[in-house]
Amino acid sequence: MHDIRWIRDNPEAFDAALGRRGLEPQAAALIALDEKRRGAIAAFEQAQARRNAASKEIGEAKKAKENARADALMAEVGELKTKLPEMDAAAKRLEEDLRKELAQIPNLPLAEVPEGADEHGNVQHHVYGEPRSYAFKPKEHVALGEGLGFMDFERAAKLSGARFVVLKSGLARLERAIGQFFLDVHTGEHGYTEVNPPLLVRDDAMFGTAQLPKFREDQFAAGSLDAEGQGYWLIPTAEVPLTNLVRESILDEKELPMRLTALTPCFRAEAGAAGRDTRGMIRQHQFTKVELVSITTPDESRNEHERMLSCAEEVLKRLGLHYRVMTLCTGDMGFASQKTYDIEVWMPGQISSQGEGGMYREISSCSVCGDFQARRMDARYRGPDNKPHFVHTLNGSGTAVGRALIAVMETYQQEDGSIAVPDVLQPYMGGLKVIERDR
C-alpha cells in the first residue's frame, strides 16, 4: 500500500516509477480522489463542531429567555443530526474508494532495478558452479521417477485432477529429507526461528501480504466464512502467515531483525499459468516450500536482502547444485516487491524451448518489499525517537522443496536410472546412498 501523502508531495516521481513497471500515470487521479476525501472529512468535522457549538448555545439562549433563538438553534441541531450520519458515511465511502485504488497499485521499484517488460529483461547477477557432464543422455525427473516406480501422476489425477503427484518410497523420503535439511541449516546456522503456522488464513492476512484483492483467481478459497464474515484461504506460501504475525502491532526496535522460517505445503490455483509446465512437478497446485521472512528497520532492509539471498544459496551449494542468480527487471518482479533476486537451478534433464538438453528453472525468489506490506498490515516498530514507524518486510524461498527434489534427481541420476543421494542428505535417509527401484 502506498502513502497518499508521499504521492501528493511527489506525483512526478510516483508516476515515473509506475512508468518503469509499464503502467500509466495515476498520481493525478489519486490526488483528486484524496482531495474529495479530505474535503468530505473537513465538511463532516465542521458540521460536527457546529452541532456541538449550537447545542451549547441553546442552553445560553434559554437562560437568556431568547426563545426564538433557542428554537432556531434546536432546529439547526436537529437538521445537523440528520445530516451528520450521511456526511460521515460519504467520507468513509471516499476513504474506502481511495484504499481500493491504492490496493491495486504495485510497489515501486528501487532505482537500481533493471528496466524491462518481461523475463527477457532480467540481468544475470552471478553464477555458482558448473553443469555436470554425463556419459549418457540425462533423463528428466518424470522418466526417472516413473522408472523407479516412486512418482505417480496418473493416480494423483484420479484423486485430485491435473497438477498433482503421488510420491512414495525413496522419493517421498528424499523430499522429506530435503525439507528437513533446509530447515536445520536455516534454524541452526542462519538464525531463523522455526514456526509451524496455520495453513488456512483469513481475508485480512491475504490482503496484508498483497495476494488480495488483485490475485484472487490464483488462490484457493476454502469456501467458508468465519464468525466475522471473513473468508478462509489455503496459503499460497508461508510468507502470508509468517509476515502477518506482526500485523497490527508495534514492535520494539530491539526485537529486530525478526527472522522466521517455516516448512509448509503451499496451494496455488495457477490460473495465470494455464498451458505452462503441464508435465511433471515443475508447476503444481500443491507443493512444499521452506519460506524465509525477515522483519526489519528501513536502514537495515537492503543488507537483510543480501543476507537472505546468501542463506538461500547456501543450502543449494551444500547440495552440490549448479545455479545462477538473476536480478529481476521491473516487468517481471512481483506485485509487492521493490527488488527481487531469483535463484535458478540447473536441471540437466529439462528440455528447453530450443530443444536443447538442460535448462535453468526458478527455485527461489528473494524480495525486499520496503514498507509496502507493513502499511497494509499496520505493522510498526518504535525507534529511538519513541515514535512508531512502519517496519520493512522481506521474504524468500529457502527453497522450494519440490523443485529441489527435481534438481537433485536430475543432477544425481545414474545411467541405470537410480539416484545417488547427496552426502549432506544421507544422514536424513538413514545412511542410504542410492535410491533404486524396490526389488
From Swiss-Prot:
Q: Which residues bind ATP?
A: 268-270, 362-365
One Pfam annotation reads Seryl_tRNA_N
Would the keyword Oxidoreductase be found if you checked this record's keyword annotation? no
The protein's GO terms of the molecular function aspect are: ATP binding; serine-tRNA ligase activity
| Keyword Aminoacyl-tRNA synthetase on entry | yes
Cellular compartment(s): Cytoplasm
Query: Which keywords are on file for this protein?
Result: Aminoacyl-tRNA synthetase, ATP-binding, Cytoplasm, Ligase, Nucleotide-binding, Protein biosynthesis
Under NCBIfam families, the record lists: serS (TIGR00414)
The task this protein performs is described as:
Catalyzes the attachment of serine to tRNA(Ser). Is also able to aminoacylate tRNA(Sec) with serine, to form the misacylated tRNA L-seryl-tRNA(Sec), which will be further converted into selenocysteinyl-tRNA(Sec).
Can you state the subunit structure given in the record? Answer: Homodimer. The tRNA molecule binds across the dimer.
- Name of the protein this chain belongs to: Serine--tRNA ligase
Q: Which organism is it from?
A: Afipia carboxidovorans (strain ATCC 49405 / DSM 1227 / KCTC 32145 / OM5) (Oligotropha carboxidovorans)
